[in-house]
Amino acid sequence: MSAIRILRLAAGGDGIGKLDDGRTVFVPRTAPGDLVEPAGLRTHKRFARARLGRLLEPSPERVEPRCPHYVRDECGGCQLQHVAAPAQREARRGFVGEALRRLARRDVDDPPLVPAEREFDYRTKITLAVSADGRRVGLHRYDRADEVFDLEWCHITVPELMELWQALRRLRPLFPPRLEGVVLRMGREGGRHVLFRTAEGEVWGGAAHLHAELRRRNAAATLWWQPSGGAPRAMAGADEAYPATVFEQVHPAMGDRVRAHALDALGAVQGRRVWDLYAGIGETTAALARAGASVESVESDRRAVAEAESRGPAARRHAGRVEDVLRELKAPDLVITNPPRTGMDARVSEALERLAPERLVYVSCDPATLARDLGRLPSFRIAEVRAFDLFPQTAHVETVVVLERAS
C-alpha cells in the first residue's frame, strides 16, 4: 500500500490523508505532516479508514505522549497526546471554523483560541467504567468502546484525584457489590468525592470501613453511593448535602474564563430580562442577578436547581427541560445558553428564532451541534466567535458565539 502524507486533523482527532484514487482516508494517532504506511484499510464509497501501520517520516508536530496507556494504544480519553500543543490548538480552532462554515453555512474565519494554563493535570472529575465481568475498573479502549482496561494514572486529571485512585485501587475488595461505575471528583474547596454507581440492591453497608481505610492512607474523601435509577447518597466522610452528580466544568479555571467572557459579551444587563438556559448550579444566573438583571433560569437537574437556590441570589428558577419550560418564561431581551454536547432541542431554537432577543450568547462544547443549532437561527448574525482550550490533549473544544438580531 502506498505511503500517505497526513494533511490535517479531522474533528474527532484522526489524521486526514489522500489515497491514490483521491479518496480521503482517516488514520488515528497521526499528526499533520506525518508520512505513514496505513494498515487495515477499510474502504467506503467516498472515504476510507485505516490504522497507523508504520511511521515512515515523523512530523515536526509529533511529540512523545506522556501517558503509558496512550503509548500502548489503550485509552480513548485522549486523542492528541502525540501532537505538540501549538498544533493541537491550531487544529481545535479549525474544528470550530470548519463546522461553522460547512454545517452552519456561516462565512467566518477560524476563531481565536484562548489557551489553557495547564496542558496536563487539569481535570477535576473522571468517570471510570467497570468491565462486564467486574474485574477491571478504568477507561474504555480507544478502538473498542466495549472493552475496559485497568487505569493506573490519568495524566490529564488533577494529581489529587489520581493519588486518591492509587489508594482506592488497593482497596477494591471494599467497593460496593454489583458495581457499574466510579466517579472521582474534586470540589472547588479542595474536597475529594467518590461516587459508586451500582445496580439496584441493598443499601451499601461498607462505606464507613472503606472511609476509615482511606483516612489511614491519608486519602480522605466523601463517599457517595447511587443505585441504578436512584438518587446519590452521601454515605461517609462529610455532612454536606452537595450532590456529587450535578454538572460542573471539569476544568474550573478555564470554565471561569468562559463564563466571564460570555457575561461580558452579553452586554449591560441592568434592568433587562435575561434567560439563562441549561443553567447548571446557577453560577451564571447568580452573576446576572448581582448585576441587576431580571433572570429566568432553566435547568433540568433538580438537584442542581436546589443547589443554585441555596447559593442565591434571587432569580426565577425553573426545574425542567428547557423545551418543556419555554411557555412559562417571559419574553427575553437577552439570552445566554449553555446546552450539553447534544445541543439545543429544535423547539428551543425555534422559540429563540421567533422571539428574536437582541443578543444571544451560545456556549458550546461541540462544534457540530453548535453549527446545527446556528443553522436553525437564520435571523441572527454572528458578531463574534471565540474558542477556549478547556480540554488539552483531546479533540474537544469550548466555543462562545455572540449572535445579534439582524436588522
Show the residue positions of the predicted features.
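A short glycine-rich, hydrophobically flanked beta-strand micro-motif that places a catalytic Asp/Glu
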Residues: 111, 177-186, 221-224
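A short, glycine/Asx- and small/polar-enriched loop/turn
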Residues: 120-124, 190, 395-396
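Rossmann-like S-adenosyl-L-methionine
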Residues: 5, 11, 174, 201-407
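Terminal RNA-binding accessory module
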Residues: 1-72, 86, 144
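Short, solvent-exposed loop/turn elements at beta->coil junctions and helix N-caps
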Residues: 112-119, 182-185, 229-230, 386-390
